[in-house]
C-alpha cells in the first residue's frame, strides 16, 4: 500500500489581504487579514532518489531568445524567482526539527512550484510559496502533529529573513491559517509564547470587498526601512501612529463582529491615511496612491493590502457604488475584481489544538 508520504503531493497557500492594522504587525501591533481564494501558490513534492529543487519555467528563467528579452524580463520581474524560497524553507525546516528533537526519516524528494499571484503587488506571493512548501515538508515527513500551527508562521518568516526580505508575521499567519484571522502581536505575547495570539473568525462576517491592482513591480521590502529606523530611534510621531494603526485592528475586530460596515469603511480609510503620513508619498509610490484615490473618488473606502501594489476597497453604499468603482478602475487602467475569501486551511484537529494553548 502506497502511503501519503510515498506519493506525489500538492499543497496550496493563498494570497493575503491586510484588512486593518498593517504595518503595525512589524511593531508589536495588531492586524485583521484574510486569504484570497482566487490567487494562490502551489508546491508539489514527489519522492525521488536525489533531492532536487526544480526552477519554474517562467519565474526562474536562465535562457532567453536575446539580450533585449533578458533585460525585459529583469525589468518586469527582477532577479529572483522561487527557487531561493524553496531552498530557504528546506533549511529552516531541517534546523527547526533538529533543534527540537523531531526525527526526520532519511529520504529525498523533488520540489516544484507554480503561482498565479501577481508579483510584487503587496499580496504576499513569496510567502505563499514558502507556506505551501512547508506544508509539503510537514506532510512528507509526517510531522504535522509535532510542529504547532502557531509556530509555522515563524518558520516561514525566518526563511524569508534569510533572504533579506523585510516583513512581519501577519502575512504568514493569514496563509497558514487561511480564512479570516484577528492577530495580536503585542510584545508580552511574543516574549512569553514566541508568537502572537491568533483568532480565526467566521469569513461571513466580511462585507463584499474588492481587489484593485496594477502591474507595477515595487520592492515592498524597501517601504518599511526609514520608518523602522525612526521607530527604533524613539520618534514619537511614528510610535504614536503605529499604536493608532494597531488600535484600528482592535476596533475593526469588534466592528466585524457587529457587521458595522459603515464604521469598517472609516477604519480602513484611517489606516491608509496614517500610513501615508508616516511613510510619505515618495515611499508609497504615485501609482499606488492613485489606486486608492480612484476608489475613493466614488466614495469607496480603500487602503493597501500590504505595502503597495494592490488595494482593498469596500463600497458601504452597496451594489450601485460597486459598479461605479469597477468603471472608475477600468477607466484608470487598473484590474478590479470582487474578492472571494479562502476558507480555513486548518484541519479539525489543528483548530481544536489552538484552544489548548493561551
Explain the meaning of each model-derived region.
Residues 309:
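Gly/Ser/Thr-rich loops at beta-strand to alpha-helix junctions
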Residues 117-121, 299-302:
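Short pre-catalytic strand/loop immediately N-terminal to key active-site residues, enriched for Gly-Thr
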Residues 69-71, 112-116:
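Short glycine/proline-rich turn/loop motifs
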Residues 26-28:
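Short, solvent-exposed loop/turn segments at secondary-structure junctions
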Amino acid at each position: 500500500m502506497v502511503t501519503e508520504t510515498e506519493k506525489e503531493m500538492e499543497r496550496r497557500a493563498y494570497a493575503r489581504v491586510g484588512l486593518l492594522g498593517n504595518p503595525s504587525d512589524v511593531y508589536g501591533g495588531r492586524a485583521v487579514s484574510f486569504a484570497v481564494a482566487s490567487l494562490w501558490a502551489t508546491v508539489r513534492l514527489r519522492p525521488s532518489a536525489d533531492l532536487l529543487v526544480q526552477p519554474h519555467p517562467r519565474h526562474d528563467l536562465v535562457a532567453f531568445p536575446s539580450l533585449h528579452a533578458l533585460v525585459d524580463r529583469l525589468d518586469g520581474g527582477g532577479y529572483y524567482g522561487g527557487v531561493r524560497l524553496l531552498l530557504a524553507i528546506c533549511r529552516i525546516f531541517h534546523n527547526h526539527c533538529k533543534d527540537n528533537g523531531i526525527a526526520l526519516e532519511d529520504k529525498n524528494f523533488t520540489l516544484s512550484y507554480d503561482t498565479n499571484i501577481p508579483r510584487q503587488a503587496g499580496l504576499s506571493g513569496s510567502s505563499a510559496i514558502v507556506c505551501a512548501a512547508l506544508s509539503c515538508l510537514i506532510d512528507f515527513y509526517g510531522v504535522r502533529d509535532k510542529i504547532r500551527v502557531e509556530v509555522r508562521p515563524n518558520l516561514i518568516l525566518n526563511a524569508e529573513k534569510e533572504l533579506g526580505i523585510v516583513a512581519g508575521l501577519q502575512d504568514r499567519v493569514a496563509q497558514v491559517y487561511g480564512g479570516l484571522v484577528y492577530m495580536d502581536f503585542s510584545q508580552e505575547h511574543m516574549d512569553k509564547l514566541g508568537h502572537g495570539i491568533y483568532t480565526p473568525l467566521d469569513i461571513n462576517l466580511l462585507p463584499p470587498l474588492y481587489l484593485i491592482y496594477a502591474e507595477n513591480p515595487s520592492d515592498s521590502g524597501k517601504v518599511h526601512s526609514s520608518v523602522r529606523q525612526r521607530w527604533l530611534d524613539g520618534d514619537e510621531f511614528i510610535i504614536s501612529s503605529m499604536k493608532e494603526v494597531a488600535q484600528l485592528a482592535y476596533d475593526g475586530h469588534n466592528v466585524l463582529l457587529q457587521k458595522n460596515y459603515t464604521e469598517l469603511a472609516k477604519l480602513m480609510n484611517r489606516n491608509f491615511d496614517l500610513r501615508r503620513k508616516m511613510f510619505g508619498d515618495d515611499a508609497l509610490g504615485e501609482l499606488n496612491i492613485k489606486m486608492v484615490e480612484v476608489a475613493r473618488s466614488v466614495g469607496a473606502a480603500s487602503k493597501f493590502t500590504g505595502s503597495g501594489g494592490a488595494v482593498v476597497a469596500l463600497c458601504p453604499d452597496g451594489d450601485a457604488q460597486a459598479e461605479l468603482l469597477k468603471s472608475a478602475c477600468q477607466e484608470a487602467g487598473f484590474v478590479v475584481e470582487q474578492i472571494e475569501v479562502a476558507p480555513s486551511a486548518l484541519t479539525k484537529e489543528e483548530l481544536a489544538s489552538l484552544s489548548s494553548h493561551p
